[in-house]
UniProtKB/Swiss-Prot annotation:
Belongs to the EF-Ts family. Disulfide bonds: none annotated. It comes from Prochlorococcus marinus (strain MIT 9301). The gene is tsf. Associates with the EF-Tu.GDP complex and induces the exchange of GDP to GTP. It remains bound to the aminoacyl-tRNA.EF-Tu.GTP complex up to the GTP hydrolysis stage on the ribosome. This is Elongation factor Ts. Its main location: cytoplasm. It holds the Pfam family EF_TS. Signal peptide: none annotated.
Protein backbone atom coordinates (compact mmCIF):
# COMPACT_ATOMS: atom_id res chain seq x y z
CA UNK A 1 0.00 0.00 0.00
CA UNK A 2 1.34 3.44 -0.91
CA UNK A 3 1.95 6.25 1.55
CA UNK A 4 -1.40 8.04 1.89
CA UNK A 5 -0.49 11.60 2.88
CA UNK A 6 -2.81 14.41 3.94
CA UNK A 7 -1.76 16.33 0.83
CA UNK A 8 -2.76 13.41 -1.40
CA UNK A 9 -6.18 13.25 0.25
CA UNK A 10 -6.59 17.03 -0.14
CA UNK A 11 -5.62 16.90 -3.82
CA UNK A 12 -8.21 14.19 -4.48
CA UNK A 13 -10.88 16.14 -2.58
CA UNK A 14 -10.11 19.27 -4.59
CA UNK A 15 -10.42 17.35 -7.85
CA UNK A 16 -13.62 15.49 -7.01
CA UNK A 17 -15.48 17.26 -4.22
CA UNK A 18 -15.78 13.88 -2.47
CA UNK A 19 -15.68 13.54 1.32
CA UNK A 20 -12.45 12.95 3.21
CA UNK A 21 -13.28 9.36 4.21
CA UNK A 22 -14.29 8.49 0.64
CA UNK A 23 -11.00 9.94 -0.64
CA UNK A 24 -8.97 8.00 1.92
CA UNK A 25 -10.77 4.79 1.00
CA UNK A 26 -10.22 5.41 -2.71
CA UNK A 27 -6.50 6.01 -2.19
CA UNK A 28 -6.16 2.93 -0.01
CA UNK A 29 -7.94 0.81 -2.61
CA UNK A 30 -5.62 2.09 -5.36
CA UNK A 31 -2.36 2.06 -3.35
CA UNK A 32 -2.05 5.84 -3.34
CA UNK A 33 -2.39 6.32 -7.10
CA UNK A 34 -4.23 9.63 -7.58
CA UNK A 35 -5.48 8.94 -11.11
CA UNK A 36 -6.71 5.46 -10.23
CA UNK A 37 -8.33 6.81 -7.06
CA UNK A 38 -10.17 9.42 -9.13
CA UNK A 39 -11.41 6.68 -11.46
CA UNK A 40 -12.42 4.55 -8.46
CA UNK A 41 -14.55 7.39 -7.10
CA UNK A 42 -16.16 7.96 -10.47
CA UNK A 43 -17.07 4.28 -10.78
CA UNK A 44 -18.64 4.43 -7.34
CA UNK A 45 -20.59 7.51 -8.41
CA UNK A 46 -19.09 9.51 -5.56
CA UNK A 47 -16.94 12.05 -7.39
CA UNK A 48 -19.76 14.00 -8.98
CA UNK A 49 -22.44 13.20 -6.41
CA UNK A 50 -20.60 14.89 -3.54
CA UNK A 51 -20.47 18.20 -5.40
CA UNK A 52 -24.27 18.17 -5.60
CA UNK A 53 -24.88 17.17 -1.98
CA UNK A 54 -25.15 20.74 -0.71
CA UNK A 55 -27.95 21.72 -3.07
CA UNK A 56 -31.55 21.87 -1.82
CA UNK A 57 -33.61 18.77 -2.58
CA UNK A 58 -37.24 19.75 -1.94
CA UNK A 59 -38.99 17.73 -4.66
CA UNK A 60 -39.23 13.96 -4.87
CA UNK A 61 -41.69 11.20 -4.17
CA UNK A 62 -43.10 9.01 -1.41
CA UNK A 63 -42.84 5.36 -2.32
CA UNK A 64 -44.27 2.21 -0.80
CA UNK A 65 -43.24 -1.42 -0.75
CA UNK A 66 -45.31 -4.36 0.48
CA UNK A 67 -43.34 -7.57 0.95
CA UNK A 68 -44.64 -10.92 -0.29
CA UNK A 69 -47.35 -12.17 2.04
CA UNK A 70 -48.32 -8.63 3.04
CA UNK A 71 -46.72 -8.97 6.48
CA UNK A 72 -44.19 -6.13 6.08
CA UNK A 73 -44.81 -2.72 4.51
CA UNK A 74 -42.68 0.39 4.03
CA UNK A 75 -43.34 4.07 3.30
CA UNK A 76 -40.27 6.07 2.27
CA UNK A 77 -39.71 9.70 1.24
CA UNK A 78 -36.94 10.26 -1.31
CA UNK A 79 -36.07 13.85 -2.28
CA UNK A 80 -34.46 15.38 -5.36
CA UNK A 81 -34.23 18.90 -6.83
CA UNK A 82 -36.86 18.83 -9.60
CA UNK A 83 -40.23 17.24 -10.24
CA UNK A 84 -39.01 16.16 -13.68
CA UNK A 85 -36.28 13.97 -12.15
CA UNK A 86 -38.70 12.63 -9.52
CA UNK A 87 -40.87 11.16 -12.29
CA UNK A 88 -37.92 9.58 -14.11
CA UNK A 89 -37.09 5.88 -14.25
CA UNK A 90 -33.74 6.14 -12.41
CA UNK A 91 -35.27 7.99 -9.46
CA UNK A 92 -38.32 5.73 -9.26
CA UNK A 93 -36.15 2.62 -9.47
CA UNK A 94 -33.98 3.95 -6.62
CA UNK A 95 -37.10 4.70 -4.57
CA UNK A 96 -38.29 1.11 -5.00
CA UNK A 97 -34.87 -0.39 -4.22
CA UNK A 98 -34.36 1.65 -1.04
CA UNK A 99 -37.91 0.91 0.14
CA UNK A 100 -37.23 -2.80 -0.41
CA UNK A 101 -33.99 -2.43 1.56
CA UNK A 102 -35.90 -1.02 4.55
CA UNK A 103 -38.31 -3.97 4.42
CA UNK A 104 -35.33 -6.35 4.54
CA UNK A 105 -33.66 -4.59 7.50
CA UNK A 106 -35.85 -4.85 10.63
CA UNK A 107 -33.14 -3.41 12.91
CA UNK A 108 -32.71 -0.19 10.93
CA UNK A 109 -34.21 2.83 12.71
CA UNK A 110 -32.45 5.89 11.28
CA UNK A 111 -31.48 7.23 7.86
CA UNK A 112 -27.97 8.37 8.85
CA UNK A 113 -25.59 8.34 11.82
CA UNK A 114 -26.31 12.05 12.42
CA UNK A 115 -29.94 11.23 13.27
CA UNK A 116 -29.11 8.93 16.20
CA UNK A 117 -29.94 10.73 19.48
CA UNK A 118 -27.10 11.26 21.93
CA UNK A 119 -28.96 9.30 24.61
CA UNK A 120 -29.01 6.22 22.36
CA UNK A 121 -25.24 6.52 21.81
CA UNK A 122 -24.68 6.92 25.55
CA UNK A 123 -26.87 3.91 26.34
CA UNK A 124 -24.91 1.73 23.90
CA UNK A 125 -21.68 2.94 25.48
CA UNK A 126 -22.85 2.00 28.97
CA UNK A 127 -23.88 -1.47 27.77
CA UNK A 128 -20.50 -2.09 26.13
CA UNK A 129 -18.50 -0.70 29.06
CA UNK A 130 -20.25 -3.15 31.38
CA UNK A 131 -19.47 -6.30 29.38
CA UNK A 132 -17.58 -9.03 31.25
CA UNK A 133 -14.88 -9.46 28.61
CA UNK A 134 -13.64 -5.91 29.30
CA UNK A 135 -13.18 -6.32 33.04
CA UNK A 136 -9.59 -5.95 34.14
CA UNK A 137 -8.46 -4.21 30.96
CA UNK A 138 -6.73 -0.81 31.20
CA UNK A 139 -9.15 2.09 30.78
CA UNK A 140 -7.48 3.39 27.61
CA UNK A 141 -7.68 0.00 25.88
CA UNK A 142 -11.24 -0.47 27.09
CA UNK A 143 -12.24 2.91 25.58
CA UNK A 144 -10.81 1.95 22.17
CA UNK A 145 -12.56 -1.43 22.15
CA UNK A 146 -15.85 0.17 23.16
CA UNK A 147 -15.47 2.87 20.51
CA UNK A 148 -15.11 0.23 17.79
CA UNK A 149 -18.04 -1.81 19.06
CA UNK A 150 -20.30 1.24 19.31
CA UNK A 151 -19.44 2.34 15.78
CA UNK A 152 -20.36 -1.14 14.53
CA UNK A 153 -23.60 -1.18 16.52
CA UNK A 154 -24.67 2.31 15.40
CA UNK A 155 -24.03 1.44 11.76
CA UNK A 156 -26.39 -1.52 12.18
CA UNK A 157 -29.14 0.98 13.03
CA UNK A 158 -28.51 3.22 10.00
CA UNK A 159 -30.09 2.71 6.58
CA UNK A 160 -27.35 4.39 4.54
CA UNK A 161 -24.68 2.15 6.11
CA UNK A 162 -26.39 -1.14 5.16
CA UNK A 163 -24.90 -3.39 2.45
CA UNK A 164 -27.21 -3.15 -0.56
CA UNK A 165 -29.32 -6.33 -0.73
CA UNK A 166 -28.80 -6.76 -4.48
CA UNK A 167 -25.02 -6.08 -4.41
CA UNK A 168 -23.24 -6.34 -1.06
CA UNK A 169 -20.13 -4.60 -2.44
CA UNK A 170 -22.17 -1.38 -2.25
CA UNK A 171 -23.84 0.35 0.67
CA UNK A 172 -27.21 2.07 0.36
CA UNK A 173 -25.32 5.36 0.52
CA UNK A 174 -23.21 4.28 -2.48
CA UNK A 175 -26.41 3.39 -4.34
CA UNK A 176 -27.91 6.84 -3.70
CA UNK A 177 -24.69 8.58 -4.77
CA UNK A 178 -24.53 6.58 -7.98
CA UNK A 179 -28.09 7.58 -8.86
CA UNK A 180 -27.31 11.23 -8.05
CA UNK A 181 -24.29 11.11 -10.36
CA UNK A 182 -26.37 9.66 -13.21
CA UNK A 183 -29.21 12.12 -12.76
CA UNK A 184 -27.09 15.20 -12.08
CA UNK A 185 -29.11 16.23 -9.03
CA UNK A 186 -28.83 15.95 -5.28
CA UNK A 187 -30.80 12.99 -3.88
CA UNK A 188 -31.63 12.52 -0.20
CA UNK A 189 -33.42 9.79 1.72
CA UNK A 190 -35.57 11.95 3.99
CA UNK A 191 -37.43 9.49 6.21
CA UNK A 192 -39.11 6.10 6.32
CA UNK A 193 -41.59 4.04 8.30
CA UNK A 194 -41.60 0.24 8.48
CA UNK A 195 -44.76 -1.65 9.40
CA UNK A 196 -44.86 -5.26 10.57
CA UNK A 197 -48.18 -7.08 10.77
CA UNK A 198 -49.27 -7.59 14.37
CA UNK A 199 -46.38 -5.57 15.82
CA UNK A 200 -47.21 -4.32 19.31
CA UNK A 201 -50.27 -6.54 19.65
CA UNK A 202 -50.18 -8.96 22.56
CA UNK A 203 -51.19 -12.38 21.30
CA UNK A 204 -52.75 -15.11 23.43
CA UNK A 205 -50.47 -18.15 23.56
CA UNK A 206 -52.55 -21.34 23.67
CA UNK A 207 -50.94 -24.65 24.56
CA UNK A 208 -51.79 -27.19 21.81
CA UNK A 209 -52.35 -30.06 24.27
CA UNK A 210 -54.70 -27.92 26.36
CA UNK A 211 -56.59 -26.87 23.23
CA UNK A 212 -57.13 -30.51 22.19
CA UNK A 213 -58.21 -31.47 25.72
CA UNK A 214 -60.74 -28.66 25.89
CA UNK A 215 -62.22 -29.73 22.55
CA UNK A 216 -62.70 -33.29 23.82
CA UNK A 217 -64.53 -32.18 26.95
CA UNK A 218 -67.03 -30.11 24.95
Amino acid sequence: MGNITAKLVKDLRDKTGAGMMDCKKALNETEGNLDKALEWLRKKGIASAEKKSGRVAAEGSIGSYIHTGSRVGVLLELNCETDFVARGDIFQSLLKDVSMQVAACPNVEYVSIDEIPEEVVEKEKQIEMGRDDLSGKPEQIKEKIVEGRIAKRLNELVLLSQPYIKDSSLTVEDLVKQAAAKIGENIKVRRFTRYTLGEGIEKNQIDFAEEVASMQTN
